[in-house]
């Protein structure tokens, strides 16, 4: 480095001071900004406010709606699969002895899951989709809700049905998972448009 003589002209010394001090000021300002705005854990911030669409579909109708909703909300999509898939005979609601009829007659029925939807702790908002069976959610939805800790999560039911309403579905699901924050569910057609889904999500304040 260049050695600057002790004796400098006033002009030369002024130039030196102008060169040194601004950098000192900038460095000090940067330190102050660092104290004012502490470092944020970026990986943690990226996991905040994540949304999941988890759904059960016996015939494929709810699948179409769930995919559309995931697209609108930019959410991850996971299917709730039964360990034993439902056949057409299982879904015959006219038959009181069909598998679905027997399950829905028993509030304690919990059909086994065929897959594990892990990582629930990474999500803040979870849409839970299903077809309406006997004016409420299929029993496997209760199995799903009891399979993980949803404490503090925002849960939003959505359902498909040709004509049946949701009945007391919201209240029944809340009893199964009381520590979650539930928003009102909605029954929709499998062909509900993206515009309608966006409007609904906006109504929810999400």
Regions found by a protein language model. Name each.
Residues 1-12:
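Extreme N-terminal basic, low-complexity initiation segments
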Residues 13-18, 37:
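Cationic, low-complexity basic patches in intrinsically disordered or flexible, solvent-exposed regions
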Residues 27, 38-125, 135-137, 142, ...:
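N-terminal beta1-alpha1-beta2 submodule of the flavodoxin-like/Rossmannoid cofactor-binding fold
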Residues 120, 146-152, 176-177:
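Short, conserved loop/helix-junction motifs that constitute active-site signature segments
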Residues 130-131:
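Glycine-rich, N-terminal phosphate-binding loop of Rossmann-like dinucleotide-binding domains
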Residues 156-192:
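Short, glycine-/small-residue-rich phosphate/pyrophosphate-handling segment
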């Amino acid at each position: 480095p260049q050695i600057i003589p002790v004796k400098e002209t006033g002009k030369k010394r002024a130039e030196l001071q102008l060169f040194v001090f601004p950098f000192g000021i900038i460095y000090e300002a940067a330190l102050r900004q660092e104290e004012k705005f502490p470092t944020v854990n970026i990986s943690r911030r990226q996991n905040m406010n994540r949304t999941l669409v988890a759904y059960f579909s016996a015939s494929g109708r709810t699948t179409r709606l769930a995919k559309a909703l995931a697209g609108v909300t930019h959410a991850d999509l996971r299917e709730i699969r039964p360990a034993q898939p439902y056949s057409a005979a299982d879904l015959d609601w006219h038959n009181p002895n069909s598998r679905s009829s027997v399950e829905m007659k028993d509030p304690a029925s919990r059909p086994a899951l065929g897959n594990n939807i892990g990582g629930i702790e990474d999500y803040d908002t979870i849409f839970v989709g299903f077809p309406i069976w006997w004016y409420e959610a299929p029993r496997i939805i209760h199995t799903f809700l009891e399979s993980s800790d949803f404490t503090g999560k925002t849960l939003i039911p959505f359902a498909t049905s040709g004509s049946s309403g949701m009945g007391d579905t919201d209240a029944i699901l809340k009893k199964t998972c009381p520590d979650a924050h539930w928003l009102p569910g909605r029954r929709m057609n499998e062909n509900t448009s993206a515009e309608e889904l966006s409007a609904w999500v906006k109504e929810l304040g999400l």
